[in-house]
From Swiss-Prot:
Disulfide bonds: none annotated. The gene is CNPY1. Pfam families: DUF3456. This is Protein canopy homolog 1. Belongs to the canopy family. InterPro entries: CNPY, DUF3456.
Length: 92
C-alpha cells in the first residue's frame, strides 16, 4: 500500500491512487527498497482493498478451491466486475 500515492485531478477533483514505487524487476528496485515511506494517505486504498476482499470472499474461496487458471483475471473481471476483460492482471 505504501507504493501508491493519492492524487487529485485539479480540474475534475477526482481522486485516484497512482503507483510511484518501482516493481521488483525494475533496475532501481534494489536502491528503492532501502527507503521507508509511511503516510496515512494510503489508508483509503487499504480500506477499499479490504472491503473488496470481504465482499467477494466466497467467490475468492471458491475460485481458489477449484484451482482456477487465470485466477487474477477471473477475480478482477468476472467476479467483482471491477476491471476491463482485456486487462492483464498479473499482480494479484
Amino acid at each position: 500500500m505504501n507504493d501508491y500515492k493519492l492524487e487529485e485531478d485539479p480540474v475534475t477533483k477526482e481522486r485516484t491512487f497512482k503507483r510511484f514505487a518501482p516493481r521488483k524487476g525494475d533496475k532501481i528496485y534494489q536502491e528503492f527498497k532501502k527507503l521507508y515511506f509511511y503516510s496515512d494517505a494510503y489508508r483509503p486504498l487499504k480500506f477499499a482493498c479490504e472491503t473488496i476482499i470481504e465482499e467477494y470472499e466466497d467467490e475468492i474461496s471458491s475460485l481458489i478451491a477449484q484451482e482456477t487458471h487465470y485466477l487474477a483475471d477471473k477475480l478482477c473481471s468476472e467476479k467483482s466486475d471491477l476491471c476491463e476483460t482485456s486487462a492483464n492482471h498479473t499482480e494479484l
